[in-house]
Design a protein with these regions (language model features):
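Bacterial Sec-dependent N-terminal signal peptides
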Residues: 1-22
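Long, contiguous binding/interaction regions
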Residues: 21-286
């Protein structure tokens, strides 16, 4: 049995909205957005798919808030196609990723309308596309002259709403921390499988939780609690400005199993005031 190490960092504190839906604009790029564009130089999108608590299937660019600032001029555009629903998660994923996303990406290449397409969602009755813009007239013209009608569906309705602080994006579209983590879990699994991993085997999965330097006692208490849950504590030490706790245990790595584990560890981290950062394992081949 050959093993190859793989580790995917999950920067949860950077990329998911807080429970209080506060803004979390991070200075990841040299140029931030201005009134001339939605995203600045160096912006990299990051699309993720998930099922929300209210039953919608959502495909969303999870990185855009890392490149923007609040602006009084920003407006949210909602493009609705009634009667274009889906039967199940598999169908929604196929439609959103292979049909809707390419269509809106082709529109996004035209920067003159100062717009960015940020999400699309489906339920059993309708399909919706969301964009943010500084220029509603140009965006509406672009949408109406595009081939969205026909490619995606009929009965299109376009509406606009002022949204300076991106509240629609954050409260109605962005995944909560549990769904965000599940998206990351799926990505790790896909990465493992691409390297030949057999996920029916038990893997030694290591979890990394961070604490502020003044919370060393909390970190020690977390490590002690993890031991009672049959985790092996690999590390509790100060590193790169935080207290790093790493513990591990054998786990299955199919999506359902590993999501159960990460939910458990995230709750444990919260109990002691820590922040769940990532999990890692080794590729296991036959």
């Amino acid at each position: 049995m050959k093993r190859v190490f793989t580790s995917i960092a999950i920067m949860a504190t950077m990329l998911f909205a807080s429970a209080q839906n506060q803004l979390f604009f991070k200075h990841m790029f040299e140029k931030k957005t201005s009134d001339e564009s939605i995203v600045g130089l160096g912006y990299r999108d990051d699309w993720g798919f998930y099922k929300s608590e209210d039953g919608r299937f959502i495909l969303i660019d999870m990185a855009i808030l890392s490149a923007v600032e609040p602006s009084a001029g920003i407006i949210c555009c909602n493009i609705t196609f009634k009667g274009e629903g889906c039967k199940n998660e598999e169908e929604a994923k196929t439609i959103l990723e292979s049909k809707v996303k390419p269509a809106i990406e082709s529109l996004a290449n035209d920067k003159k309308n100062k717009s960015a397409y940020v999400a699309a969602s489906m339920d059993s009755t309708k399909l919706e596309i969301f964009a943010y813009t500084y220029n509603t007239e140009e965006l509406k013209k672009e949408i109406e002259k595009s081939k969205l009608v026909g490619k995606i569906g009929q009965n299109m309705n376009i509406s606009f709403k002022n949204d300076k602080n991106w509240n629609i994006y954050q409260t109605k579209l962005f995944p909560d921390q549990w769904n965000y983590q599940k998206i990351q879990n799926q990505r790790i699994i896909e990465d493992l499988q691409a390297k030949g991993d057999v996920n029916t085997k038990l893997h030694i999965v290591s979890h990394f939780i961070s604490f502020p330097l003044d919370k060393r006692e909390n970190a020690d208490n977390l490590a002690a609690k993890a031991k009672t849950w049959k985790y092996y504590v690999d590390q509790v030490e100060e590193e790169e400005g935080v207290v790093k706790v790493v513990f591990s245990k054998k786990s299955k790595t199919d999506l359902e199993s590993i999501t159960t584990v990460t939910n458990e560890v995230m709750n444990l981290a919260k109990e002691f005031g820590g922040e769940y950062v990532e999990w890692s394992t080794r590729v296991m081949r036959d």
